[in-house]
From Swiss-Prot:
Specific in hydrolyzing the terminal glycosidic bond of polygalacturonic acid and oligogalacturonates. GO terms for biological process: cell wall organization; pectin catabolic process. One of its GO terms (molecular function) is polygalacturonase activity. It holds the Pfam family Glyco_hydro_28. Its EC number is 3.2.1.67. PbH1 repeats lie at residues 231-252, 254-274, 285-306, 327-348, 362-394. The active site is at D245, H268. Belongs to the glycosyl hydrolase 28 family. The keyword Protease does not apply. It is found in: Secreted. This is Probable exopolygalacturonase X.
Length: 432
């Protein structure tokens, strides 16, 4: 069931297309294939006027020109970033006022490498020290055109190697958007996560091309493709992701999410979590479908990661544990893997290396109604003889976890799973 070659061809074609009409007229619901959103997406109103953003050129800040065009064409217009032009952004842009507007990005939007400015002025979102170059929100907003957003990440990769506590901006911040289409677009060299989708609903991401590696010895770290947070009814599809962390991550209070037709390379898998990081807070992730995924050269394929009930530290800038909540109705269906460490990983000891301590203080989050189906491929062999791990910190917090038609082997031909504190009768895998 290796569909990667033809799949990449199809996605490449999709990424090469950009709308040429005066506004974004394609139905959001019709664009969602083969699986439709949990709730119908609202229609986009016609656009009747066009504004072209003026580029100052020579690396001069174009932020004022961008904001002027957005205000001029808000409520029924289209703002165009012209082809073969570079737009420089050196100012944090609050674009949460947008309504019934399209942004057609044909050229390149590049953010400056002034790390002192961005640490002081980027938008702070609280969760996991997330900050963004800009925040785009409002109602009925479409961003497309096949152009490029460039985060100038190299200076950040090198700076993070010196100081793990710096605040690295996220390239693309969707904050408080109600109804929208994002893509096709190219996202390059994000300092941290590529996209944060927070406090948003009814948004489809379609045809996103993500790539950006370090050119120095310092890796590009924490470069998640998408992180959904406090968001509902989101569709992510038809995209190619070359990165160094989660391909997609469902952060706290992500509900009714469809992820389909992705090619992920170099990632940490498609992950629920991490959840339960903040003591006393309630994290819920439910109603998620992940379908038709190709996963290459990754640490994980499908992943659920939950913090234990005791304080733990994943790294200097990532600590937590003791949170509450639930993970429910999550399905991973049809995943091809190649050179992936774990085909499936479920852990409630995220960030805690002392497993005895973790088991003494089991997670406060429950995991239930989980389905892993139709997996094919070969692991990296790093975990030989195991190819997957489904481990709960207590049988009292895990139930109804299913695995069926899992045809994954290591390079040596083994297919063992680590299965702890789960009902093995529901797992059609070789629990060692």
């Amino acid at each position: 069931m290796k569909f990667s070659y033809s799949f990449v061809q199809v996605v490449s074609l999709l990424l090469s297309l950009s709308p040429s009409v005066e506004g974004f007229t394609r139905s959001r619901n019709d664009a969602c294939k083969p699986n439709h959103p949990f709730r119908p997406l609202p229609p986009s109103q016609p656009r009747t006027k066009t504004c072209h953003v003026v580029s100052n050129g020579h690396g001069k800040d174009d932020s004022k020109n961008i904001m002027q065009a957005l205000h001029k064409c808000n409520n029924g217009g289209k703002v165009v970033f012209d082809a073969n032009k570079v737009y420089t952004v050196g100012t944090a842009l609050d674009m949460t006022f947008l309504k019934h507007i399209d942004l057609e990005v044909l050229g390149k939007i590049q953010f400056t490498n002034d790390t002192d400015y961005w640490q002081a002025h980027s938008f702070k979102h609280g969760f996991q020290n997330a900050t963004t170059f800009f925040q785009l929100g409002g109602q009925d907003v479409n961003v497309y055109g096949g152009g490029t957003f460039d985060g100038n990440g190299q200076v950040w990769y090198d700076l993070y190697a010196e100081d793990a506590l710096i605040l690295r901006p996220i390239l693309f911040g969707i904050i408080g958007l109600k109804g929208g289409t994002i893509g096709p677009l190219k996202l390059r060299y994000s300092p941290q996560w590529y996209q944060l989708v927070a406090n948003s609903s009814d948004v489809i991401f379609d045809g996103i091309d993500i790539s950006g590696y370090s050119s120095s010895k310092n890796e590009a770290k924490n470069t998640d493709g998408w992180d959904t947070y406090r968001s509902d009814n989101i569709v992510i599809q038809n995209s190619v992701i070359n990165n160094g962390d989660d391909c997609v991550s469902f952060k706290p209070n992500s509900t009714n999410i469809i992820v389909q037709n992705l090619h992920c390379n170099g990632s940490h898998g498609i992950s629920v979590g991490s959840l339960g990081q903040y003591k006393g807070e309630v994290d819920i992730v439910q109603n998620v479908l992940v379908y038709n995924i190709s996963m290459y050269n990754a640490s994980d394929g499908a992943r659920i990661k939950v913090w234990p009930g005791v304080s733990s530290a994943m790294s200097e800038d990532l600590q937590g544990g003791g949170g509450l909540g639930s993970v429910k109705n999550i399905t991973y269906n049809q995943m091809y893997i190649e050179n992936v460490d774990w085909a499936i990983e479920v852990t409630q000891c995220y960030g805690q290396k002392n497993l005895t301590l973790c088991n003494e203080h089991p997670s406060n989050l429950t995991i239930s109604d989980i389905h892993f189906k139709n997996f094919r491929g070969t692991t990296s062999g790093k975990r030989d003889p195991d190819v997957g791990t489904i481990v709960c910190s207590s049988p009292n917090v895990c139930s109804d976890i299913h695995a069926e038609n899992i045809n994954v082997k290591s390079p040596k031909g083994t297919d063992e799973f680590v299965c702890t504190n789960v009902d093995k009768s529901l797992l059609d895998v070789n629990c060692a």
